[in-house]
C-alpha cells in the first residue's frame, strides 16, 4: 500500500491508496497542502477537520448527510454526491453541481485524492478528477488533464450571452491597474496600451467623472484599451472599451446588456472551477491569479504560484486571452510570462514605484524582450 495515502481514506482502502499513489507519482512535484484531509466513503466514527464525505446517488442516508453540509451551519464540512456522469460538492453552505463529459473513471476517487495531495482545494481537485480517465497515469508524456473536451461543465448555468463579447488581442501586453483617471492618463502617456481603472469607495458623482475621464484618455490613443473595474453600467454609458468583473459579479451583472453594448469583458478566476464558470460566458479575456501574495486587494484565494498558473494556461489558452495578476513585479515578470500567458497585470509595481516612468519603461522592455525570444 502507498504509505503517502495510508491515512487518506476512511474506512482504510488499500486498493484506493495504491491507485492514488500511482496517479500522484505522475503528477509532478507539488507542495502538499497544509490543511489536513481525508476522503470518507462511509460516515467516520470520529469526524475530523478536513473530512470529505463521498456518497453515491443511491445512498439515501448518505445523500441526507451530504445535503446537510450545504447548510450554513456546517461551514467547514465538505461532501460529494456522485453518479455515473455527475458529481455535486457541498461546502460552506453552497452546492456546486458538475456534469462530466464522459462516465466517471473507476479511479476518479483515487485521482481526487492525488489532486488534493497536490494542494488543490476539494472543488478544484474534483474538477480535475472528473476530467481524469482510467489509465492516464500509464501514458507516455504528461498525464495532467488539459483537453477542454474532457472537463466537466457546471450544471444549471444559463446560456452564454448573445451576441458574444467583443474580442481582445491574444496578447494584451503590460496591463497596469490604477486607482484613478490621473493614473490612467500617466500610464497611457508612458506607452502602456492596456489599462484598468479600479476606483474603490468613491461617491457616485466622482465615480462617474473618473470613469468618463479615463475613457476619454483612452480615446486619445487609437490603440488604447481602457477597462473599467466593476461599474459596467457607467462603462456602457461612457462607451468604454471594456469592463472587468470578479466571480462574485457574475450573479448580479447583466452580462447580456454588457455584450449588447459592445464592451469587452474580462473575468477573474482563482482555480479550475472558477475558470469553468468564467469560460462558460466566453469572455474577451480571462484573468488568472493571484500569482503571488498581494496587499493591493483583498483576495480570498491563496497565491497560486507559477506552477499552477502554467497549468491553468495550458488548459485555457486556446479558449481566451490570458492575463496573470497578483503581486507581480519586474523581477518575477519573465517567469510569469514563461507560463504561457499573453498579458500580466501590475499594480504596485507601477503605482508604488519611486519613479513610475522608469518602472513602466523597464516593464515594457521586459515584455518586448520575452515576446521577441519566443
Q: Positions of the model-derived regions?
A:
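Alpha-helix-loop-beta-strand connector modules within alpha/beta enzyme cores
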Residues: 208-230, 247, 255-270, 301-330, ...
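Short, small-residue alpha-helix embedded
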Residues: 101-122, 126
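Glycine-rich phosphate-binding active-site loops on the catalytic face of alpha/beta enzymes
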Residues: 118-121, 136-140, 193, 198-200, ...
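Conserved phosphate-donor
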Residues: 53-100
Amino acid at each position: 500500500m502507498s504509505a503517502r495515502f495510508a491515512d487518506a481514506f476512511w474506512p482504510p482502502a488499500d486498493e484506493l491508496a495504491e491507485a492514488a499513489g500511482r496517479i500522484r507519482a505522475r503528477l509532478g512535484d507539488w507542495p502538499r497542502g497544509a490543511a489536513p484531509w481525508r476522503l470518507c466513503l462511509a460516515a467516520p466514527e470520529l469526524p475530523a477537520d478536513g473530512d470529505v464525505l463521498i456518497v453515491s446517488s443511491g445512498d439515501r442516508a448518505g445523500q441526507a448527510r451530504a445535503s446537510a453540509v450545504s447548510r450554513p451551519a456546517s461551514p467547514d464540512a465538505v461532501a460529494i454526491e456522485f453518479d455515473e456522469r455527475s458529481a455535486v460538492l457541498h461546502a460552506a453552505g453552497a452546492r456546486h453541481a458538475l456534469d462530466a463529459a464522459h462516465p466517471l473513471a473507476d479511479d476518479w476517487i483515487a485521482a481526487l485524492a492525488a489532486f488534493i495531495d497536490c494542494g488543490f482545494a476539494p472543488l478544484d481537485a474534483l474538477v480535475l478528477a472528473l476530467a481524469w480517465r482510467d489509465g492516464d497515469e500509464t501514458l507516455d508524456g504528461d498525464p495532467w488533464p488539459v483537453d477542454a473536451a474532457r472537463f466537466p461543465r457546471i450544471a444549471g448555468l444559463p446560456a452564454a450571452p448573445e451576441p458574444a463579447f467583443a474580442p481582445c488581442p491574444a496578447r494584451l501586453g503590460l496591463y497596469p491597474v490604477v486607482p484613478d483617471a490621473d493614473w490612467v492618463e500617466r500610464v497611457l502617456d508612458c506607452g502602456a496600451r492596456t489599462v484598468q481603472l479600479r476606483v474603490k469607495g468613491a461617491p457616485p458623482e466622482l465615480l462617474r467623472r473618473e470613469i468618463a475621464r479615463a475613457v476619454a484618455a483612452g480615446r486619445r490613443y487609437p490603440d488604447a484599451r481602457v477597462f473599467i473595474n466593476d461599474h459596467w453600467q457607467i462603462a456602457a454609458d461612457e462607451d468604454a472599451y471594456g469592463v472587468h468583473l470578479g466571480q462574485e459579479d457574475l450573479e448580479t451583472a447583466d452580462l447580456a446588456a454588457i455584450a449588447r453594448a459592445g464592451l469587452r469583458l474580462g473575468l477573474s478566476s482563482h482555480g479550475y472551477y472558477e475558470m469553468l464558470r468564467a469560460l462558460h460566458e466566453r469572455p474577451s479575456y480571462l484573468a488568472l491569479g493571484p500569482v503571488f501574495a498581494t496587499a493591493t486587494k483583498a483576495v480570498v484565494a491563496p497565491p497560486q504560484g507559477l506552477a499552477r498558473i502554467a497549468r491553468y494556461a495550458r488548459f485555457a489558452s486556446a479558449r481566451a486571452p490570458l492575463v496573470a495578476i497578483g503581486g507581480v513585479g519586474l523581477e518575477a515578470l519573465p517567469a510569469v510570462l514563461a507560463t504561457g500567458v499573453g498579458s500580466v497585470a501590475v499594480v504596485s509595481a507601477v503605482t508604488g514605484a519611486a519613479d513610475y516612468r522608469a518602472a513602466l519603461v523597464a516593464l515594457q522592455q521586459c515584455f518586448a524582450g520575452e515576446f521577441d525570444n519566443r
